[in-house]
Amino acid sequence: DALLARIEQAIADLDYRPSLMARGLKRGRTRLIGLIIADITNPYSVNVMSGIEAACREKGFTLLVCNTNNELDQELHYLDLLRSYQVEGIVVNAVGMREDGLNRLQQSALPMVLIDRKIPDFACDVVGLDNAQAATTATEHLVEKGFEAILFLSEPLGSVNTRRERL
């Protein structure tokens, strides 16, 4: 009992906090999920991030958020960073990873989900709309309401293939 009391006193005196990272690495479970997001200022992205964070918290995970600011090089940087933290999964809402980034993901065998993005010839889970069907339904609705001149507005299409699907 005396030894335990001395240990507890030393913990209090030193304000010791165990390293959750070290504990997670030792156990092989970090309880971390990485989110690579294209633009953290986009209201859609904020809503997506909020929902993902709530789901992670409910399951006992901590969400690490990485904002790429729509820069491809940042996507690769954050991908490597999240892998070094040994996250247990990655959620990606990004501009579009290059082939070397995709190869790194496939080799890591990390569970991954794409949000509102599709990467050709890359097998993984995707959460998003059927963009072509949604655009068709919206256009048909406007035509049925008597509209004749219909304008499509979007952020720049860039390399985001789901935006092209909406045309």
Where are these regions (language model features)?
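Short acidic/polar active-site loop segments enriched in Thr and Asp
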Residues: 31, 88, 147-150
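N-terminal winged-helix
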Residues: 37-54
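Central regulatory/effector-binding core of bacterial HTH transcription factors
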Residues: 54-103
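Interdomain hinge and pocket-entrance segments immediately C-terminal to HTH DNA-binding domains
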Residues: 18, 27-41, 59-61, 155
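Bacterial carbohydrate/catabolite-sensing allosteric modules
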Residues: 12-15, 51-62, 77, 83, ...
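N-terminal helix-turn-helix DNA-binding module of bacterial transcription factors
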Residues: 1-31
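Short histidine/acidic/glycine/proline-rich micro-motifs that form metal-
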Residues: 39-42, 69-70, 96, 143, ...
